[in-house]
Amino acid sequence: MIGYNKFMKKFLAILVLGLFIAYYLFGLNELAVIFWAIAFCAGYVSLSASIRIWQKREIRKYHKKHKTIPRTYEDLEKHLKSSISVVSHLKKKLTLPNVTLLAATSVEIEEHQISLKISSQNIEFGAVKLLSSSLPEKKYSDIEYVSVKPMGRSDANRFLIEDLHKYFETSHCLYVEADGFVVNADLWKKEFLEFDYIGAPWPNEIQMDPNLVGSPGLPGPIPILNMKENCVGGGGFSLRSHKLLKTVSKINYDSLKFPIKNEDLLICHYLYKDMIDKGIRFAPPKLAAQFAIECDPLHLYGQDVNSVFGFHARHMRDYFLKEYMRRAPIGKW
């Protein structure tokens, strides 16, 4: 759909320009120019709407046909009949030698491995690492498996703040979780590496879900966070510099008294001013919106699934996995 939109916009622009050239150079009647311009614009809108309706119907049909989401990457390979590996060799990979792709987890280990494999399909990273307390059912030669202690939710947040910097040596790491991975490798921008932190932008206000916060049993109502000072951004699919992680590693996580201790909120919200004072650079929201999507795209920067490098959202995972199964075999991932 994105390719179609780009083509139609260019075609429409050239057409309107041609009409005005015809008017000025060949004396075409002014009313005729206006009529044809309006007619073609209306036709474009109508055709675009029809294509979108058709596309949504086809996606629904596809999802109905493929109800089962693969649990392991091996299952995913079997579903695709190994065609993804053939397609990968046909496409020129993006090379990011200064970025380590990594995940750190004690839960959903197979799902985290899927995120690593999909993210690295069309990108050659400096390294790819799975930091986990146990191994997945099948190991892959392009992933380095690193053993870490079992982690609960608070342990995971503490680990990302205090210890993550120890596990990579490149200038940046691309941190992914089970519900986030690269979806459009060709939308990588070199500007991403100019910043110490970039993640999907949040809304200006966040009503926290008590089941997802890093500090269970919070007294009183869950706060509404005002993110207007900095809305960048979601940690579940984020690019972080080694400088940033060395800086936050000096923080004693257990001593922090904030009501919510999710690591991305600590870095990007509660400790934002401290980070800025230490020379940490956060990507501007408009660039972050090109990096990843996490919230409802209708409310943030006109994002859609074809306009971002990656995503992070539990409610989007099944959709993107099905899109991957549909698009990867024909070289569209």
Feature map (PLM): residue ranges:
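N-terminal anchoring/stem segment of glycosyltransferases
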Residues: 32-35, 50, 65-172
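Generic structural signal for small/hydrophobic residues in well-ordered secondary structure
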Residues: 128, 178-179, 241
